[in-house]
């Protein structure tokens, strides 16, 4: 028969083990929760910047409407890139994350010595590493070895585009003048599992991105300076002073669009909301002047879904795009509309092309957004 005093002794011996197991379980659970709340891994690799964009292209391809787009007619340079690497942006790119570096005179921008905006990118997709490396060696002026990684220095229009193959499915690109920027990406790729990683601006505002968003952007808004940068020139009409914009898109039976515009104070947020409401009123006014589509149920549902709210120091804009409206937009696109491919990925510099890249004397939208990769021609 076991002595009565044996049970307390057994408990005392087991208690430290139980406590240790509970602590380990709690730590594992905390890491899982934190990783679930953290930005996508591709975005966490990006350097500190003034704006971020992430797109899950693998998900976007599941939309039935995209299968109805006209076929892409490739320009010779892009076709050569595809032939040499086997990589097709419109087919093989699964995720894309971009960091936008504003010039220093844009309120302490992160572009370093560059007087123009610069970009850093992470591409995730189905790469043939052997063919890709062979291509990069061919177009590089030099190759830097850094912590067992090769960084390919590609001269392009008076600047250097740096490319590093991080893994079998990930590639980093940057045209930032400081080579330490892409070296930092390489360093972060070695400790990617950390849910605490990523640029400060991204970490701070990612919590405002709705759950399950397949595309989002987080941008510092500098209205006065952005007026000189094509693609952002109209923002000064909406923002009275600097702000932060959190834009997102997610698909739940319809495409839900949301913009959270964080102002410096409640008064500025109210002004933003009032100006945005004026734009929405213009859209509603245009609803009756678009011909036969004016009575279309899907189009009407979209216009009716446009809403503007004001809450504290933020203005909130929301809209819901029905699947039918998406299909109508795609079906009604002109024959010379841009095709889904490298040119539709803003800021991309991974592929060589005949036109300038982002930040080169103007807007990324006006020039080939992929300096280094030829864009495909318009669909026919």
Language-model-detected regions and their locations in the chain:
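Single conserved position on a long alpha-helix in the C-terminal lobe of the eukaryotic protein kinase
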Residues: 53, 89-198, 259-262, 309, ...
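Sec/Tat-exported extracytoplasmic proteins
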Residues: 57, 61, 85, 104, ...
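An internal, short helix-loop-strand segment that often contains or flanks glycine-aspartate motifs
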Residues: 64, 68-93, 143-253, 269, ...
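Short, conserved charged micro-motifs
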Residues: 62-64, 128-134, 266-273
């Amino acid at each position: 028969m076991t002595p009565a005093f044996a049970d307390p002794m057994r408990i005392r011996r087991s208690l430290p083990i139980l406590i240790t197991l509970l602590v380990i379980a709690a730590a594992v659970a905390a890491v899982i929760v934190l990783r679930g709340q953290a930005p996508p891994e591709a975005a966490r690799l990006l350097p500190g910047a003034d704006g971020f964009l992430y797109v899950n292209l693998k998900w976007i391809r599941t939309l039935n409407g995209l299968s109805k787009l006209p076929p892409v007619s490739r320009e010779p340079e892009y076709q050569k890139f595809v032939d040499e690497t086997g990589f097709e942006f419109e087919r093989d790119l699964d995720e894309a994350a971009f960091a936008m570096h504003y010039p220093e005179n844009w309120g302490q921008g992160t572009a370093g010595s560059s007087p123009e905006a610069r970009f850093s990118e992470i591409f995730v997709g189905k790469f043939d590493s052997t063919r890709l490396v062979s291509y990069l060696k061919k177009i590089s002026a030099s190759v830097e070895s850094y912590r067992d990684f090769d960084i390919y220095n590609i001269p392009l229009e008076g600047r250097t585009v740096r490319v590093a193959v991080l893994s079998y499915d990930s590639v980093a690109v940057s045209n930032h003048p400081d080579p330490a920027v892409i070296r930092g990406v390489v360093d972060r790729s070695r400790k990617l599992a950390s849910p605490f990683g990523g640029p400060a601006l991204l970490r701070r505002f990612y919590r405002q991105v709705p759950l399950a968003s397949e595309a989002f952007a987080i941008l510092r808004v500098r209205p006065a300076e952005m007026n000189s940068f094509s693609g952002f020139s109209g923002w000064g009409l909406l923002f009275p002073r600097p702000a932060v914009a959190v834009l997102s898109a997610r698909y739940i039976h319809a495409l839900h669009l949301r913009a959270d515009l964080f102002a410096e104070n409640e008064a500025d947020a109210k002004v933003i909301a009032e100006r945005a409401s004026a734009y929405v009123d213009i859209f509603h006014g245009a609803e009756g002047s678009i011909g036969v589509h004016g009575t279309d149920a899907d189009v009407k549902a979209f216009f009716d879904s446009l809403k503007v709210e004001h809450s504290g120091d933020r203005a909130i804009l929301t809209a819901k795009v029905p699947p039918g409206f998406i299909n109508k937009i795609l079906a009604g696109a002109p024959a010379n509309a841009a095709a889904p491919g490298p040119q539709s990925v803003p800021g991309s510099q991974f592929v060589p092309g005949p036109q300038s890249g982002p930040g080169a004397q103007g807007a990324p939208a006006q020039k080939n957004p992929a300096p280094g990769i030829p864009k495909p021609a318009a669909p026919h």
